[in-house]
Amino acid sequence: MNHLRAEGPASVLAIGTANPENILIQDEFPDYYFRVTKSEHMTQLKEKFRKICDKSMIRKRNCFLNEEHLKQNPRLVEHEMQTLDARQDMLVVEVPKLGKDACAKAIKEWGQPKSKITHLIFTSASTTDMPGADYHCAKLLGLSPSVKRVMMYQLGCYGGGTVLRIAKDIAENNKGARVLAVCCDIMACLFRGPSDSDLELLVGQAIFGDGAAAVIVGAEPDESVGERPIFELVSTGQTILPNSEGTIGGHIREAGLIFDLHKDVPMLISNNIEKCLIEAFTPIGISDWNSIFWITHPGGKAILDKVEEKLHLKKEKFVDSRHVLSEHGNMSSSTVLFVMDELRKRSLEEGKSTTGDGFEWGVLFGFGPGLTVETVVLRSVPINY
């Protein structure tokens, strides 16, 4: 049966990203948010929110939900109004559309006919429907009716690592497979007006943005038709951090997606991340965490700061994660793939010798509900100028 399996590791062959056109400037967002939610009388809460936004290190975000949508659906701005139907009516349409835009860019970079795509993986925490966003995305792209689909709902911020793990397994166990993996989240699911008793909501309103990212994964790249690897997917792992239950969560309720984020999350991640690194890199013989490149989900400034401090990392290790956080906010599952895209582009622009900032080996980390950590060991490829 080995002849049915690919030889060699799977690689990322192309990356595409997409965002809604509507842009939110972070400095202006507190005034906007309290105005459109008719909450300007809550002056003390607004000042708290302004401080949260100021500390976020986010410059701007993209957001599908604009003021026109809120005028058409005025109940969305109420804190506890039953608005799940209205939110889902929008998201079941918009999530596959934004995902399709990212997929189209990845397919264009890949340069091969879309008929060669054998598998489609889609993840989103924004919506749930049957048939799912995978089905609608496949139809929008005009993929073969026989493309093998996997739909994963409600993974949250670790989903970017999950799709790479599953895409790797599929590509390596099905010779000739080309896997299109896409993450898309639109935060209209959690936009609500403020409440004095719900400060976690304010954190979510301050950091989350909308985005989609897609990768094409395959083993044995066919260079005769122009396929080129960007990163090899060497190994993958997933773990639940100890004593972390209830620290990150999301709950679908009549008012939409209710977001939980405990203040101990940065500490929990920073205290446990080295164990993940040791398990992943001991087989390779690497123990210097500054000797690898980093593709880290920027869940927030505090997480990056704590990990950087705990592992004594050089400032440049998180430059791509911080850039994506600044320009887009936390886009949930797609964010870490935006960081991957930023790293390979910056490596080329700065004349680095590899797609991994000049380093051979690297790690991709996704963090999310559970508290779940996805770890992917990557190998960069040389850049030929």
Curated annotation (Swiss-Prot):
Expressed in glandular trichomes. Its main location: cytoplasm. It comes from Cannabis sativa (Hemp). The active site is at C157. GO terms for biological process: polyketide biosynthetic process. This is Polyketide synthase 5. The lineage of its organism: Eukaryota, Viridiplantae, Streptophyta, Embryophyta, Tracheophyta. One of its GO terms (molecular function) is acyltransferase activity, transferring groups other than amino-acyl groups. InterPro entries: Chalcone/stilbene_synt_C, Chalcone/stilbene_synt_N, Chalcone/stilbene_synthase_AS, Polyketide_synthase_type-III, Thiolase-like.
